[in-house]
Amino acid sequence: MKQVSIIGGTGSIGTQTLDVIAANPDRFQLVSFAFGKNIEVALPWLNRLRPELVAVLDETVKEQLEAVLDYSPTVLVGEDGLIAVATADQADIVITAVVGAVGLRPTLAAIEAGKSIGLANKETLVTAGHLVMKKAREKGVAILPVDSEHAAIFQCLNGERRQDVRQIILTASGGSFRDQTREQLANVTVEQALNHPNWSMGAKITIDSATMMNKGFEVIEAHWLFDVTYDEIDVVLHRESIIHSMVEFNDGAVMAQLGMPDMREPIQYALTYPSRLEIKGGERLNLKQIGRLNFAEASFERYPLLRLAFEAGRAGGSMPSVLNAANEQAVDRFLKGEISFLEIEASVEAALQAHENIEDPSLDQILESDRWARAFVASLSLAN
């Protein structure tokens, strides 16, 4: 039986991971669990799966949770709690599903403790890929991608030689506004932006999908996970989200991984690797019913944040950390109604232009760059 820890347990990836664990009680056991403050979502899962260690945002949430739990786990708070969950002695694998740069320290701690990582927190590699991959190599730790695109590439590369790879092709749905012009984007609402055509995801990642920032993060993540240059990564629009990504080899062969848009598939693959297990209640792919698959160019002109991600990735150093933090802050401001949809892009670009890159940043310098970018965007005054 595989022992599992989850960081970010009440978000979209976290709850779907819990679905997989609950559906396979003979294969998986939840030993530790971290979430912020969403007790309403966490409580039934905790009472059902009964992990011994729980971490929450602060003392207030701890008191509220302990008052309603029907068992008595150890409950910790704050970043120390996150790290305790990530390094729990019993855990074989840690699913890092927390959103944002807050996942960086717990992920590094889990690697240091020798835990396999099911990586759903792409910001960890975006902000500190050089530190994370170096530490993983030193500790002999497997980094298993949980997001659908990198899980697809991981499977396509299984058994292949790095020198035979010509390029990685990431597919993108195009997000909520894929059929709208940039002129039409000027006045879109938060509600419209959160209406993703294919995937059920959390609010931030749904906005990131609409701006293509999410795909930009995946470009940087692919660079670190698969040891490819940015010239060896391409992005193509694929509105059906059936082909999750592709790898082109030197002989012209292209290998693709297909499946229904169901996040339980890459989550379960990370948990069971190198084995496979039937997804209970999952919908099987029926190509005859789908009929056709469509592809189009992912234009930098249409999606400026994708361009900025390539630029920040190539620049390296502290630039990707600024890219991520500026975007997080800008998306938060958009969700609060403080800025328009297009001003997300303007905020991120302004932060990158204002930042003085640190070429080989330490962890502290990465976190300081993160803080600087958030403060910069929070104080930015933009004309609507």
UniProtKB/Swiss-Prot annotation:
Keywords: Isoprene biosynthesis, Manganese, Metal-binding, NADP, Oxidoreductase
Cofactor names: Mg(2+); Mn(2+)
Record pathway: Isoprenoid biosynthesis; isopentenyl diphosphate biosynthesis via DXP pathway; isopentenyl diphosphate from 1-deoxy-D-xylulose 5-phosphate: step 1/6
Enzyme class, broadest EC rank: oxidoreductase
Gene Ontology terms for molecular function: 1-deoxy-D-xylulose-5-phosphate reductoisomerase activity; manganese ion binding; NADPH binding
Disulfide bonds: none
EC number(s) per entry: 1.1.1.267
Binding-site list for 1-deoxy-D-xylulose 5-phosphate: K122, S148, E149, S173, H196, S209, N214, K215, E218
GO biological process: isopentenyl diphosphate biosynthetic process, methylerythritol 4-phosphate pathway involved in terpenoid biosynthetic process
Residues reported in the UniProt entry to bind NADPH: T10, G11, S12, I13, G36, K37, N38, N121, E123, G202
Transmembrane segments: none
Binding-site positions, Mn(2+): D147, E149, E218
One Pfam family this sequence matches: DXPR_C
InterPro entries attached to this UniProt entry: DXP_reductoisomerase (IPR003821), DXP_reductoisomerase_C (IPR013644), DXP_reductoisomerase_N (IPR013512), DXPR_C (IPR026877), DXPR_C_sf (IPR036169), NAD(P)-bd_dom_sf (IPR036291)
Reaction catalysis annotation: 2-C-methyl-D-erythritol 4-phosphate + NADP(+) = 1-deoxy-D-xylulose 5-phosphate + NADPH + H(+)
Family: Belongs to the DXR family.
Functional summary from the UniProt entry: Catalyzes the NADPH-dependent rearrangement and reduction of 1-deoxy-D-xylulose-5-phosphate (DXP) to 2-C-methyl-D-erythritol 4-phosphate (MEP).
UniProt xrefs under PANTHER family: 1-DEOXY-D-XYLULOSE 5-PHOSPHATE REDUCTOISOMERASE (PTHR30525), 1-DEOXY-D-XYLULOSE 5-PHOSPHATE REDUCTOISOMERASE, CHLOROPLASTIC (PTHR30525:SF0)
Protein name (Swiss-Prot/TrEMBL): 1-deoxy-D-xylulose 5-phosphate reductoisomerase
Annotated organism of origin: Exiguobacterium sibiricum (strain DSM 17290 / CCUG 55495 / CIP 109462 / JCM 13490 / 255-15)
